[in-house]
């Protein structure tokens, strides 16, 4: 686990050199084919060296929900257990981890007319900022997890409230209080804790490196294949900043600035979530690989004795 650019993949690959381990992707963008550079997807060489699951599962126009992820991940986990292999979930998408461990919230269905009306209001009437302010009033916990420009999640929060009379965060909390269906899991949670300024510097540097590796061309290719900017996948951090540049909304310098800013904000939200994650072991960057080895060995030895 861990925020973007913290070194999750490198740590997982190191562990795989010492344990019978296969990696289960828990990044909500790496599930999409063609979204490689911007999602920091493991290289082909890395994926050939160590078995990776749930990468390139579907196309960017096919939303991959937390429910779909939970079903697929549990199948992989059970298969790994049957073969005597350790499944290691690697990624920074908190609701994917939560879906596996706690189950999925049973949220009431929302009539399509409500969603359509909210989208119309956002586009044609009051605007996104006003809708976000309304979300802050009716569902502060959900609003705190949503970017002011995230139209999809703002509409999602308001639509559930209008349809059920209860905020989305209420239904999520209700589900978390219930025992999830599925196998009981024993989990060792690890994350690398960088000083904030060092992490932000890594994020800025990585975004620039992605551009050198062809991130802009990747986005151009996705758009040329018909994957438009309103798709949830295409609004992922980094992608939407470059789409704005390609559509003439601002210059390249501004696109880089927005991409880096959005990545830093995303990391901040990830850290906030991780700080509240029970049982998580934080590792200092110096010596993180050895510390992770020690933690995993102790974890496996503890349950081996039981």
From Swiss-Prot:
ATP binds at residues 2-9. Substrate binds at residues 4-9. It comes from the Bacteria. Keywords: ATP-binding, Magnesium, Nucleotide-binding, Transferase, tRNA processing. One of its GO terms (molecular function) is ATP binding. Its cofactor is Mg(2+). It holds the Pfam family IPPT. Its EC number is 2.5.1.75. InterPro entries: Dimethylallyltransferase, IPT, P-loop_NTPase. Signal peptide: none annotated. It catalyses: adenosine(37) in tRNA + dimethylallyl diphosphate = N(6)-dimethylallyladenosine(37) in tRNA + diphosphate. SUPFAM superfamilies: P-loop containing nucleoside triphosphate hydrolases. Residues 27-30, 152-156 are annotated as: Interaction with substrate tRNA. The record marks 93 as: Interaction with substrate tRNA. GO terms for biological process: tRNA modification. Belongs to the IPP transferase family. NCBIfam families: miaA. Monomer. Catalyzes the transfer of a dimethylallyl group onto the adenine at position 37 in tRNAs that read codons beginning with uridine, leading to the formation of N6-(dimethylallyl)adenosine (i(6)A). This is tRNA dimethylallyltransferase. It comes from Magnetococcus marinus (strain ATCC BAA-1437 / JCM 17883 / MC-1). The lineage of its organism: Bacteria, Pseudomonadati, Pseudomonadota, Alphaproteobacteria, Magnetococcales. The gene is miaA.
């Amino acid at each position: 686990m861990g925020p973007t650019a913290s070194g999750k993949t490198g740590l997982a690959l190191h562990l795989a050199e010492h344990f019978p381990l296969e990696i289960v992707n828990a990044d909500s963008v790496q599930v999409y084919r063609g979204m490689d550079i911007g999602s920091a997807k493991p290289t082909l060489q890395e994926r050939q060296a160590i078995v990776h699951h749930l990468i390139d599962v579907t196309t960017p126009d096919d939303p991959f929900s937390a429910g779909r992820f939970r079903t697929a991940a549990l199948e992989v986990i059970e298969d790994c257990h049957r073969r005597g292999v350790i499944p290691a979930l690697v990624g920074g998408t908190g609701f994917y981890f939560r879906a596996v461990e706690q189950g999925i919230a049973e949220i009431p269905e929302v009539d399509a007319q409500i969603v359509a009306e909210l989208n119309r209001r956002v586009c044609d009437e009051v605007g996104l900022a006003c809708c976000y302010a309304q979300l802050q009033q009716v569902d502060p916990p959900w609003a705190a997890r949503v970017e002011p420009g995230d139209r999809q999640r703002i509409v999602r929060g308001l639509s559930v409230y209008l349809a059920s009379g209860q905020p989305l965060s209420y239904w999520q909390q209700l589900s978390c209080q219930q025992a999830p269906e599925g196998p009981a899991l024993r989990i060792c949670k690890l994350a690398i804790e960088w000083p904030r300024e060092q992490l932000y510097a890594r994020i800025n540097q990585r975004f620039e490196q992605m551009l050198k590796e062809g991130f802009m061309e990747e986005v151009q290719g996705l758009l040329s294949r018909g994957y438009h900017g309103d798709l949830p996948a295409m609004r992922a951090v980094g992608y939407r900043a470059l789409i704005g540049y390609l559509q003439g909304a601002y210059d390249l310098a501004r696109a880089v600035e927005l991409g880096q800013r959005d990545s830093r904000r995303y990391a901040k939200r990830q850290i906030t979530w991780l700080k509240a994650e029970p049982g998580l072991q934080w590792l200092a960057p110096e010596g993180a690989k050895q510390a992770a080895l020690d933690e995993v060995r102790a974890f496996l030895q503890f349950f081996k004795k039981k």
